[in-house]
Amino acid sequence: MSGFVVSKPEQSHHRLFDFAKTAIINIFAHPYATVCELYCGGAPETDKWEAAPIGHYIGIDTSSGISSVREAWESQRKNYDVEFFEADPSKDDFEIQLQKKLEQADLVSCWRHLQLCFETEESARRLLTNVACLLKPGGYFFGITPDSSTIWAKYQKNVEAYHNRSGAKPNVFPNYIRSESYMITFELEEEKFPLFGKRYQLKFSGDNASEDHCLVHFPSLIRLAREAGLEFVEIQSLTDFYDDNRAQFASLLMNAGPNFVDPRGKLLPRAFDLLGLYATFIFQKPDPDIEPPLTTPIPFESSNNHDERELPVITVITDASAPAEDPSQGLGKIVEQKGILGPGPADLRFSEAI
């Protein structure tokens, strides 16, 4: 029996996360594509990719995750070729370890581990450099990560409310965020948002264990991606992603479980709260032979401690004369670029770009 037979998750946040992955894969996947999943151990999205149908699947994970996946795969037959490699995308050098796979992937996805790579700048840089090595020119890197703009905004509001209460101690900050659906606890009480290593635990209601994460500082993500040769396309909260694509994905979300949307397909409060905790990110490796590469603005320089309230909007400007994307490549459904640096609440977005 396969170790990753697809079954409908029980918890609401698992079902919503699964819906988001399915929707994003439906947008990007195209026939005969070569797809690479980073940190595929545990539950690779094999059935979602098969519906495309893709032509080749490459799974990469550490030794603890890849062995069980490889064994389980032997009991299944897919309509596309499959390869697994044991490597850590945030530590190992793929130019050395995976020389034969350089510039082979049309798509590279990372669903749950981008935030873990932001423990240090070195690990985040290594991940993005490896992604750039794997992608063909014109290929896309995308996935889902907790929305650090939303998380930090909620935390700041909690701090503000704490200090507005009478009797609050000066220079003391609460270290948690609580909602009906989840609780986030930061390891350190601090007022600033460091670029790397801001650790927290996320525990959903109904779950026994918490998840360890690091906040992803979006300006640093964009900067490191550009240095690795990846151009920023979009970072968008999953609530905005759903609203932009409601006509296409409302029925898919209705099938994911009850009490997520109303009869018109509008998100209900609990689903809005859970989806709003996450964001999707998209980067592209430019193909100079097809069109001029997108211009990614360079985030302004800052100190190592940075309050995300200071983050300006970054607008991505494309060349209007550039040829249109080929919809046969599965990219015609991507909405026009938002140009926002961090998804987060609207009151954290600045009115003008730099």
From Swiss-Prot:
The record marks 48, 278 as: mRNA cap binding. One of its GO terms (cellular component) is nucleus. mRNA capping methyltransferase that methylates the N7 position of the added guanosine to the 5'-cap structure of mRNAs. Binds RNA containing 5'-terminal GpppC. Keywords: Methyltransferase, mRNA capping, mRNA processing, Nucleus, RNA-binding, S-adenosyl-L-methionine, Transferase. S-adenosyl-L-methionine binds at residues 21, 61, 88-89. The keyword Ligase does not apply. It is found in: Nucleus. Pfam families: mRNA_G-N7_MeTrfase. Its EC number is 2.1.1.56. It comes from Arabidopsis thaliana. The lineage of its organism: Eukaryota, Viridiplantae, Streptophyta, Embryophyta, Tracheophyta. The keyword Transmembrane does not apply. It catalyses: a 5'-end (5'-triphosphoguanosine)-ribonucleoside in mRNA + S-adenosyl-L-methionine = a 5'-end (N(7)-methyl 5'-triphosphoguanosine)-ribonucleoside in mRNA + S-adenosyl-L-homocysteine. This is mRNA cap guanine-N(7) methyltransferase 2. InterPro entries: mRNA_G-N7_MeTrfase_dom, RG7MT1, SAM-dependent_MTases_sf. GO terms for molecular function: mRNA 5'-cap (guanine-N7-)-methyltransferase activity; RNA binding. Belongs to the class I-like SAM-binding methyltransferase superfamily. mRNA cap 0 methyltransferase family. It is an enzyme of class 2 (transferase). Residues 8-286 form the mRNA cap 0 methyltransferase domain.
